C-alpha cells in the first residue's frame, strides 16, 4: 500500500507570481483623442525550467500590442510564473502538464494583470479571451 502511494501521480501549485511586467503608452496624451478603432496583436510563449527534483518553474509570457493605424497605443508585457511540484508522471504527460496544464493555470492571472494595467493607463477595458493551451500544445508537437 505504501509503495502504491509513492508511485501515485502528484501535482501541486507551490507559488504563482509575476516575474516581469511592463506597460508602455508612448503616444499619450494625443492618442486619447483619436477615433478608437484599434488593431490588437497577442503573442504567447511558455518556458519551463527544472529547479530541482520534481519542482518546475513555468513562465507564461503574454505580449499585447495595440495600434491605431500605425501609431502604437500601448504595449503590455507580462511574464506570469508559477512553481509547480510534479511527480511520478511519465515524460509525455510531464511535457503536456508543463506546456498546457500549467499555462492554463497561469493565464487568468496574466489576463487580470493586463486588464488592470490597461485600465490604469486610461484605455478602454481589455478582457483577453480564454486560450485553449491544450490545442496550442498539440499543434506545437505535430
UniProtKB/Swiss-Prot annotation:
Keywords: Chaperone, Cytoplasm, Protein transport, Translocation, Transport. GO terms for molecular function: unfolded protein binding. The keyword Cytoplasm applies. GO terms for biological process: protein folding; protein tetramerization; protein transport. The keyword Chaperone applies. It comes from the Bacteria. It is found in: Cytoplasm. Its main location: cytoplasm. Gene3D superfamilies: SecB-like. GO terms for cellular component: cytoplasm. InterPro entries: SecB, SecB-like_sf. Pfam families: SecB. Belongs to the SecB family. Homotetramer, a dimer of dimers. One homotetramer interacts with 1 SecA dimer. PANTHER family: PROTEIN-EXPORT PROTEIN SECB, PTHR36918. One of the proteins required for the normal export of preproteins out of the cell cytoplasm. It is a molecular chaperone that binds to a subset of precursor proteins, maintaining them in a translocation-competent state. It also specifically binds to its receptor SecA. This is Protein-export protein SecB. It comes from Buchnera aphidicola subsp. Acyrthosiphon pisum (strain APS).
Amino acid at each position: 500500500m505504501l509503495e502504491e502511494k509513492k508511485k501515485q501521480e502528484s501535482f501541486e501549485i507551490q507559488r504563482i507570481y509575476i516575474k516581469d511586467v511592463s506597460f508602455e503608452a508612448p503616444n499619450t496624451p494625443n492618442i486619447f483623442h483619436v477615433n478608437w478603432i484599434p488593431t490588437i496583436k497577442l503573442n504567447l510563449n511558455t518556458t519551463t525550467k527544472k529547479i530541482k527534483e520534481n519542482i518546475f518553474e513555468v513562465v507564461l509570457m503574454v505580449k499585447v500590442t495595440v495600434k491605431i493605424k500605425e501609431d502604437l497605443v500601448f504595449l503590455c508585457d507580462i511574464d506570469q510564473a508559477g512553481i509547480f511540484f510534479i511527480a511520478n508522471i511519465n515524460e509525455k504527460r510531464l511535457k503536456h502538464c508543463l506546456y498546457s496544464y500549467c499555462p492554463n493555470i497561469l493565464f487568468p492571472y496574466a489576463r487580470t494583470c493586463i486588464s488592470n494595467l490597461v485600465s490604469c493607463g486610461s484605455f478602454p477595458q481589455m478582457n483577453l479571451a480564454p486560450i485553449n493551451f491544450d490545442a496550442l500544445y498539440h499543434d506545437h508537437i505535430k
